[in-house]
Regions:
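An alpha-helical, amphipathic repeat domain used for nucleic-acid recognition
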Residues: 1-170
């Protein structure tokens, strides 16, 4: 396929039109990496590679956008990416990149959740573990994160009893 035109679209995105009236939207980095310009010929394999690279970049940017607001576990982020992009290989590549740069860290996320559930919300260990399980933190990671809070359970129970039943205890 031959590229007919490359026009600026929005921000750093460009619209690339091919001779069969097919159009795709690519980021400037993808255009420069693959040398996309008007008049250039691409075979189907190279075009698929360009589209895959573009989708991978979009997925990574989407993941960073989501991480701007709150932390995610590996499982949560993978599920969100898979719902949007429907490509397991692409999602695994993006997740590996996020883990390697330290954006996704299940141990850190589990420690933050444990503190939130036990200290702030006054949940018991079982409920905190169940909530962490729903968020994608499983097994030993959840156990290790909750370990420092086992001795706080009695304090939490006393506080809850005092708060809820103090009028009956007089």
């Amino acid at each position: 396929m031959q590229v007919v035109s490359v026009k600026k679209y929005k921000g750093s995105s460009y619209e690339v039109v091919f001779n069969d009236d097919r159009q795709i939207y690519l980021h400037i980095d993808i255009i420069t990496d693959y040398g996309v310009r008007a008049g250039r010929e691409f075979d189907e394999k190279t075009l698929d590679e360009i589209i895959y690279a573009s989708n991978k970049r979009r997925a990574f940017q989407y993941a960073l956008y989501l991480l701007d607001y709150r932390d995610y576990s590996y499982r949560e982020m993978y599920t969100k990416l898979e719902k949007t992009y429907k490509n397991e290989d692409l999602c695994f590549e993006v997740m590996d990149k996020l883990v390697s740069i330290g954006c996704i860290n299940d141990k850190r996320y589990a420690a933050m959740l444990a503190k939130r559930y036990v200290e702030i919300k006054k949940f018991g260990i079982y409920r905190a573990k169940n909530e962490m399980y729903q968020r994608g933190i499983r097994g030993e990671t959840a156990e290790n994160a909750l370990e420092p809070y086992y001795d706080m359970i009695e304090e939490n129970i006393a506080l809850l009893l005092e708060k809820k039943y103090s009028r009956y205890l007089t």
